[in-house]
Amino acid sequence: MSIENLKAALPEYAKDLKLNLGSISRTTVLDEEQLWGTLLASAAATRNAQVLAEIGAEAADNLSAQAYQAALGAVSIMGMNNVFYRGRGFLEGQYDDLRAGLRMNIIANPGVDKANFELWSFAVSSVNGCSHCVVAHEHTLREAGVGREAVLEALKAAAIVCGVAQALTAAQTLAAVG
């Protein structure tokens, strides 16, 4: 199970994604923990079993057990937060004065470098389409000294993984009915 398996599974019309996936997996902009945590969290956020299984297996070889769990923790907490903050945003400030009342302890104590956890949360928030969370995590990353290039590289990784998941879902669905 690996990035190579995903590339091989992509249909011809997704050749750009195949090339982008190969490139992002060799990036030098992010360190190994940042890269594989971003790929793992983004894969989980796509909800595509094949993408998660392939990336998850390779991420296990490239991340410590603690970082692996933290990346999955980022996707879990963002699954809740992205819905809450995106939904509250739709309400045009009418509920901004009320306390969320949601437990989010993992954000304060992720078990890994906080900037890496923020990077993974940023990537997942991008996949999930929560502009409030994307902006908040980007601001926190920049305040922590994470460079613009690293932030953009994480965004690219999330976008590529999301595109791969969509291409595979389309190909599998059409193959099943065709």
Swiss-Prot record:
The keyword Disulfide bond applies. It holds the Pfam family CMD. Disulfide bonds join 130-133. The active site is at 130 (proton donor), 133 (cysteine sulfenic acid (-soh) intermediate). The keyword Chloroplast does not apply. Gene3D superfamilies: AhpD-like. It comes from the Bacteria. GO terms for biological process: cell redox homeostasis; response to oxidative stress. Its EC number is 1.11.1.28. GO terms for molecular function: alkyl hydroperoxide reductase activity; disulfide oxidoreductase activity; hydroperoxide reductase activity; peroxiredoxin activity. Keywords: Antioxidant, Disulfide bond, Oxidoreductase, Peroxidase, Redox-active center. It catalyses: N(6)-[(R)-dihydrolipoyl]-L-lysyl-[lipoyl-carrier protein] + a hydroperoxide = N(6)-[(R)-lipoyl]-L-lysyl-[lipoyl-carrier protein] + an alcohol + H2O. Homotrimer. NCBIfam families: ahpD, ahpD_dom. Belongs to the AhpD family. PANTHER family: ALKYL HYDROPEROXIDE REDUCTASE AHPD. Antioxidant protein with alkyl hydroperoxidase activity. Required for the reduction of the AhpC active site cysteine residues and for the regeneration of the AhpC enzyme activity. This is Alkyl hydroperoxide reductase AhpD. The lineage of its organism: Bacteria, Bacillati, Actinomycetota, Actinomycetes, Mycobacteriales.
